[in-house]
Amino acid sequence: FLLFFFFSKNCIGQYRNQILFPGENGTHLLNLLFDNYKTSNVLSYTDARVKLYKEIYNVHDTVYCVYSHHGLYLDPNYSNPIDYLSKGGSNNGINCEHTFPQSKGADAGNARSDMHHLFPARAAVNEARSNYPYSEIDDTKTKTWYYLAEELAAKPKTLVDEYSESLSGFFEPREDHKGNVARAIFYFFTMYEIQSDRAFFESMRPTLCHWHMQDPVDSLEWKRTFMISQYQDGKANPFVLDCTLPQRCYCEGLINCISGIEGVKFEGADNLISPNPASDLIRIYLNASDFSITQFRIT
């Protein structure tokens, strides 16, 4: 069989990429993003949630929690999807998560219903997140693990990456939502800095920079930002469109990113391909130059 090792200095891929304002950095770039991507019009908070549940995050009439993948069927003929999914305020109902908490600056004006930072979440998990900053939590210190409708006090034996974690004062989303969180918060702080809690943002910034690289934009995130833009002056989240923006705005020293790799992530020597070990045939599609591949044949 074949065992592959990848060694990469600056290689990461997202679904697609558009370089915005090339050559610009720092404050001037942030001003350009504000001037060109700040929406003047958003839906009401009620209408925004209806769009999220019936269109943006509706998968074959089911809405899934971004933190636990808990899904609820939504009757397409029901007149009030907010009420339908809440299940009377049940812990297993689904409500709306403000990635940048309302108490930290998203409670007024367009910020409250800007869909670029709103996500469906299981009620109990949303409550556990509260207004806590996002953080990497030591697994040995995690208080509660969340997956589907489960809430575990001990570390799960399988599917660990599918779980979100909470600890008093901190919250860690599941692995495949970390990049989405980072890009939503970079967007929010760029567009609504004047009303945002800067200390709250700064406490998360290094972690968000890492998560942006760890979990690049996939096809769903790319599709959804354009779906949202239809209701917000045609303006997508620029941090989804251009993977270099965090580095140029908030994450000085962050490694470079590349585009054109769907479903495969390259993160230094930690990356694994599947299947690995492999036999017979495996295909790898690359769009990068600064990497090396070492192949060992073991008999």
Residue ranges and their predicted role:
Residues 1-15, 261:
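Bacterial Sec-dependent N-terminal signal peptides
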Residues 11-73:
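N-terminal module-boundary/linker segments of secreted carbohydrate-active enzymes
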Residues 45-52, 79-80, 103-107, 168-172, ...:
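Short alpha-helical segments and helix-capping/turn motifs at coil-helix boundaries
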Residues 63, 70-93:
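Short, His- and charge-rich active-site/binding loops that engage polyanionic ligands
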Residues 67-73, 189-193, 261:
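Short, flexible beta-strand-to-coil junctions
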Residues 79-83, 111-112, 284-285:
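Short, polar loop/linker segments at the starts of domains and inter-domain junctions
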Residues 84-258:
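Domain-level detector of nuclease and nuclease-like folds
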Residues 263-299:
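C-terminal outer-membrane/trafficking sorting elements
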